[in-house]
């Protein structure tokens, strides 16, 4: 039997609104291993988006735990490599976790290249040349390298979706 490599462990996850009157999530438990493909399906209002947004703490869960790559990201403090308790840096974990929103937006006044390099330059403090090199490599992977100078209005819906994914 193969050993599973757990990436995300969700245990008894809850998200309640109106002081518990509305239970968007009520005891969700799931283990997602590296390489797994997971589909979340259900009718409108069943908590799919709330669950996904909770995985990277865009929604703060009411209860339960989310362990991502061995770290319980629902805790305010975690143990660092030296064994000291330090404040959790959720941005560090978000850099390893990608999400494509149902309704994604690209800045219409910016080229695809500018859209793709904005976050690496502003958030990761990457220099422009390095950010552009990485963006071109990603665009090449999804077959859109030749569209780097285009504006979002010049792309099809599917092309915009691929840009949002990379």
State where each predicted segment sits.
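ABC family nucleotide-binding domain
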Residues: 3-166
